[in-house]
């Protein structure tokens, strides 16, 4: 920005169409968060009505993780070929239809299939909507676009908990799923009347052929093998997450098989830039591993170790969820001010100062605990609001939606693994100590991976001929990866 434009408030750089585009995508994210937590809120009611075992009930939560990676790939590829807007509409229709099916489900099998559909739609929502908003806003405001957008998920989760307390005691658990589809009419109206993303339109005007991930994987020379690998990965994830296997060794082996398949898909679709894509998947995996033990097991910690009543638990969880939502917006401002990676690192380091007091203070003062959780989640969880901006910058426009959707949702499998790790450590330590140690240790891993710009560094180490020295979203130099003139490539510091 010039000095003149810097004097203008940031929101005045956005026109009505850009705000309308953001509103449509944000509402989709709110619905995403709303639908995601519904199953957790009514799991005991569903278990009682259908007579499910604990493993069957838990598998209904895991079902969405089984299909998310595929949804990110397919709907992301749709967004790359046909436009971000169509992929957004398709994704919200999918997870809304899945939500309606949950409310109508006559039994476990139908409910499980509906959760698979929700997982596909949620994954597409993340990749398509994030890419759409980021590409629609001015480059200088794209961290705000990313952070503000992701805040919708946390708001949706808070709204779901509030609606649950009003609806389920009166009308039962099915009514909650029916309510979850009501905003779909407004969202579809908005998305029908919004323009296409600027970057995608500019790319289409070049009239150069576009090969999406679907074209490469399922229409190329290895399509038969890739279809078989897709089925193998899906079955392996189903066996791992539904509790069908009692052997930890077999589960670990299947996990490695899935990892190999996902890396294979990234290598095929990204060509010589595969080191960047694989490293991004690792970053997202660790981002989920450090944050999701607290997200998943905090209610259990409050109930068991602090002996809080349900009303008190709800109050503390509100502080936590609201802090994450505020943190997404704060992260957007920090990202545009300091730069995406620098803001991410500083915010995570600040959160580390608070994580130990959160679990050391005990339960004597609920308000102090709530405030500590608010700020810890604001800094530690909320900064993930700019993760789409961070990931998207490493992909070119013609593969950005699929690259972002696939990378994020493969890494999101860490969200399914994280509670298990927390529970295993809790067998030897108190649950609070387990959550604290996991979050504290793994956060530093993410700090190093992002702070040292490891995607670009690994790219330089393994395939330097495909090293891209500039961020594809903002056109800024990638710190630690800028090529030196001449044959030799080195690492040059920059101001990004």
Curated annotation (Swiss-Prot):
Q: Quick one: where's region Disordered?
A: 472-496
Gene Ontology CC annotations of this record: plasma membrane
Entry annotated with the keyword Transferase: no
- The main location class comes to membrane
InterPro entries tied to this protein: MFS, MFS_dom, MFS_trans_sf, SA_transporter
Asked if the Swiss-Prot or TrEMBL record annotates the protein with the keyword Cell inner membrane, the reply is: yes
Q: Which PROSITE patterns match?
A: MFS
Job of this protein: Catalyzes the proton-dependent transport of sialic acid.
The protein here is known as Sialic acid transporter NanT
- Tell me the name of the encoding gene: nanT
